[in-house]
Amino acid sequence: MKLLVIGNGGREHALAWKLAQSPKVETVFVAPGNAGTAIEPKLQNIDLTAHQDLIEFCRKENIVFTVVGPEAPLAAGIVDDFRAAGLKIFGPTQYAAQLESSKDFAKAFMAKYNIPTAQYQTFENADAAHDYVNQKGAPIVIKADGLAAGKGVIVAMTLDEAHAAIDDMLLDNKMGNAGARVVIEDFLQGEEASFIVMVDGNNVLPMATSQDHKRLLDGDKGLNTGGMGAYSPAPVVTPVVYERAMNEIILPTVAGMKAEGHEFTGFLYAGLMIDQSGAPYTIEFNCRFGDPETQPIMSRLNSDLSDLVEAAIDGKLDSVTAEWSPQTAVGVVLAAQNYPETPKKGDIISGLDAANQIGKVFHAGTTANEKGDVLTNGGRVLCVVGLGDNVAQAKAKAYGALEKISFDGMQYRKDIADKAINR
């Protein structure tokens, strides 16, 4: 069968790569894809992004189903458009995707359904926001209401930082429409984890646990990014935390969306903060697989992903199970110079073949020129995954592979997965 994956990042490379491993799959088209999906066996890039063009392509090629990678097409209603055209697609509707595309919608939803999260208020007026911050004190968290590519969250450790973030979003319009409203919430302490599940509207199939590294620099310093590395499984998600996250967060969310008259289908990602007592709180929802978490998680999935997605689209997730490798996977992101602000593009990347002999290199911000050179073409350029019998082995494999790669201005963290090693 022929499938379609929408997106051009490392997450989409990993999803398409995993789907293509199924003996039932002939070709996975990736729209628009990158330099990695262009050369991966059984994958083929197509240069289409408009919903109607993609719908016509699916009809012409008899695509069995489509998987949506990134958040922007979901927020733009691609699932609604495909379903209206009678095509099978895995992802949430535009309404359900508001769990990610509007922080205010998500927080109000959590309040209504008693899903544990930080206390918050929403503001459009800068003066009122400044007053609230002065009253609450720091540390405090300022979030753009809309989609900001994972960079719309400022964890302000001082009041000055909080006031500056409010001014950037509400007065200086630095986030555009995404920051025209801000959610200000209490700072939660603990350890973060990514809890990702597949949902068919009623049934839930958990994916492997993982932990992301959001900050640019070692020791969780520097600017927030889309994610600089991840590992799976995440030891902080103990069996007790796992049960609590399912029962207190995931299942009430799925039931709540159904009660609202908008069943949630697709990947649901709860960003968790786990406090010292083991209580999980929801920091954010994403309505798609995480990036870079997808890369290590897919590296551990032994099941046929196409079977799982088909079951989910057909409302039969309760009839399948996901089998995971007992190994640990560590993924390290290689980012361009000046990421996350003004990443440099167009530099030649060398050493990819040598790195792929040691680990698995997933492409994100890459493109190829006429000569076949792979060039940097985005902020996060590559994610290198290593597998091992324990976290230390997997980390060594990932960094061993990564050391073969070079491009001008390449930056990466050297401490990915250390939290798990040091536990």
Swiss-Prot record:
Keyword ATP-binding: yes
Gene Ontology molecular function terms on file: ATP binding; metal ion binding; phosphoribosylamine-glycine ligase activity
Cofactor binding, note field: Binds 1 Mg(2+) or Mn(2+) ion per subunit.
Positions contributing to Mg(2+) binding: E284, N286
Gene3D superfamilies xref list: 3.40.50.20, ATP-grasp fold, A domain (3.30.1490.20), ATP-grasp fold, B domain (3.30.470.20), Phosphoribosylglycinamide synthetase, C-terminal domain (3.90.600.10)
UniProt entry keywords in alphabetical sequence: ATP-binding, Ligase, Magnesium, Manganese, Metal-binding, Nucleotide-binding, Purine biosynthesis
The keyword Nucleus is assigned to this record: no
A Gene Ontology BP annotation from the UniProt entry: 'de novo' IMP biosynthetic process
Residue span, ATP-grasp domain: 107-314
Pfam family, one: GARS_C
Top EC group: ligase
InterPro entries in UniProt: ATP-grasp, ATP_grasp_subdomain_1, PreATP-grasp_dom_sf, PRibGlycinamid_synth_ATP-grasp, PRibGlycinamide_synth, PRibGlycinamide_synth_C-dom, PRibGlycinamide_synth_C_sf, PRibGlycinamide_synth_CS
The family this protein is said to belong to: Belongs to the GARS family.
Protein's recorded name: Phosphoribosylamine--glycine ligase
